[in-house]
Design a protein with these regions (language model features):
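Extracellular/lumenal glycan-associated surfaces
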Residues: 176, 199-204, 331-338
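Short, surface-exposed polybasic-aromatic patches that bind anionic ligands, especially phosphate groups
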Residues: 299-313
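Polybasic, low-complexity association/targeting segments
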Residues: 102, 182-183, 233, 411, ...
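Extracellular/surface-exposed low-complexity segments
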Residues: 203-249
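A short, polar beta-strand/turn micro-motif
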Residues: 238-302, 323-394, 406-443, 485-487
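Short beta-strand elements of solenoid repeat domains
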Residues: 17-21, 42-47, 68-73, 94-99, ...
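Structural signature of tandem-repeat unit edges
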Residues: 1-13, 23-39, 49-65, 75-91, ...
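C-terminal outer-membrane/trafficking sorting elements
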Residues: 311, 440-487
Length: 487
């Protein structure tokens, strides 16, 4: 269309059907359009199926209330930038992107949908989309979601955790023929209380699995199964690195939780795991380490002993540990001592509760504590001067290590613990922890306050011991003597 860039649209309020069914158009320049007064863009580009590109980034949509069918059947478009759209007043998004089958990506994260009442057919037939971020959608006023995602055959998952469907009356064929869809994340706000019709909602979602699997329940395809307790939805309960953790059932449970030192673990709420695992390989010669896992660990037939911290005194050089019997409670930070040169931790458990938060293990007087970690921690010389770690054979806190040496960073991997001095005047440099240095980040790996090849052990009668024993031990190491009590 020649000269369209010279069209003065300053006073136009209605652009409905403006280019509708211009199916032979391959290009269209609307970058100079003034849309400040436009209230409806209904079907503006509907059935412009030959358009290869369309630039609407300059559209001022602050007054638009209707985007019904706006880009319907623009099947030739592979990309469309609507990130600058102001949709605060829009009430109708019915079929807005329907049959945009060539779109490979679509960013609607900036859409304000607080006033939208219809999202029916909105993404129907967007078969080339492999992902769609709707986490900012406000659906509190939406009444119609029928056919919303029908034939979005490229989508493998949908995160609808922000969807509030209390006003929705029609969910018919909402996910119909989403044949690649494996997971739909939804919260307790996705309800069907007012739904009047919701037939074929999950029809032909052949890979979908929530509490039940579609392929084993093909007769269950209506809105009654739009939940995570008995149906096809999944509740988002946490993240494991970049991976979402989903759980289903009346008692929330995830199928398999595989924890890894390179992945931060965050739980949004307590849940259970049908299977959970964690492993760690330590350097040869490691005697002591720390551990904090979100599931219970049995101590039966393990290659380590586990201890809780009873007391610690930097001034007198006294530490007191008490051996844990039976099991380590979920989320509890502990000190462990490897047996017989073992360097591998390997846990595989079944049907365990997962603790949302790490526990704090304080000494009796509250002056010291073991703080567990589910996530990586980077220590600061300004705010972590009460935390105690060790570099090589020197026992230092992170503040000293960062301030007095060339070390640029000191950190801990997940599923470990560090000691903190909670007293009103923390003593710097408590000789409690040993760490190993690798790469650019120092990672807490061991608790070797007393046990290494250079240490000598004696009982109270002065008799030399081969290893630390239960009771009172006198330990000499590097010109320092300390009393260690192990219960």
């Amino acid at each position: 269309i020649e000269g369209i860039e010279n069209l003065n649209t300053e006073k136009v309020t209605n652009m409905a059907l403006m280019f509708a069914s211009c199916s032979d158009l391959t290009s269209l320049d609307v970058t100079k359009f003034n849309t400040a007064n436009v209230t409806t863009l209904m079907s503006m580009f509907s059935n412009c199926s030959s358009l290869k590109s369309l630039d609407v980034t300059n559209f001022d949509t602050r007054n638009v209330t209707n985007m019904f069918y706006m880009f319907n059947n623009c099947s030739g478009l592979t990309s469309l930038d609507v990130t600058k759209f102001n949709t605060a007043k829009v009430r109708n998004m019915y079929s807005m992107f329907m049959k945009c089958s060539g779109l490979k990506s679509l960013d609607v994260t900036n859409f304000d949908t607080g006033n939208v009442i219809s999202m029916a057919y909105m993404f129907y037939g967007c078969s080339a989309l492999t992902s769609l971020d709707l986490t900012n959608f406000n659906t509190a006023k939406v009444m119609d979601m029928c056919f919303m995602f029908k034939k979005c055959s490229g989508l493998t998952s949908l995160n609808l955790t922000k969807f509030n469907t209390a006003e929705v009356t029609d969910m018919s064929q909402m996910f119909n023929e989403c044949s690649a869809l494996t997971t739909i994340y939804a919260s307790d706000e996705f309800v069907t209380t007012n739904v009047e019709t919701g037939s074929n909602m999950f029809f032909n979602c052949i890979k979908l699995k929530g509490f039940i699997e579609y392929n084993k329940n093909t007769d269950k395809e209506n809105y009654k199964y739009a939940n995570y307790k008995t149906g096809y939805f999944t509740k988002l309960v946490g993240k494991n690195g970049d991976e979402k953790i989903g759980a289903t059932g009346e008692t929330l449970a995830t199928d398999n939780l595989v924890l890894d030192d390179d992945k931060d673990f965050v739980a949004y709420e307590p849940f259970a795991a049908k299977a959970a695992s964690y492993s760690r390989t330590m350097k040869e010669g490691t005697a002591w380490a720390t551990l904090c896992l979100p599931f219970e660990v049995s101590l039966q037939n393990q290659n380590f002993r586990a201890f809780k911290l009873l007391s610690a005194d930097d001034v007198t050089g006294t530490v007191e540990l008490e051996e844990i019997e039976g099991s380590i409670a979920a989320g509890t930070p502990v000190i462990i001592k490897m047996k017989d040169g073992a360097t591998k931790l390997d846990f595989t458990v079944a049907n365990k509760e997962i603790a949302k938060d790490v526990q704090t293990a304080e000494t009796a007087n509250g002056n010291y504590q073991l703080q567990g970690l589910y996530t990586q921690k980077e220590f600061s010389k300004d705010t972590d001067n009460n935390c105690y770690i060790v570099k090589g054979s020197k026992l230092m806190n992170p503040a000293k290590l960062l301030d007095k040496t060339t070390t640029e960073s000191v950190g801990s991997k997940p599923f470990r613990a560090y000691m903190a001095d909670n007293s009103s005047a923390p003593a710097a440099g408590a000789r409690m922890f040993s760490i190993s240095v690798g790469g650019s980040t120092t990672a807490i790996e061991q608790l070797e306050s007393t046990a290494d090849s250079k240490a000598e052990y004696y009982d109270l009668q002065g008799r030399r011991l081969q290893n630390l024993q239960k009771g009172i031990n006198i330990v000499k190491r590097g010109g320092k003597t300390m009393k260690v009590i192990i219960k």
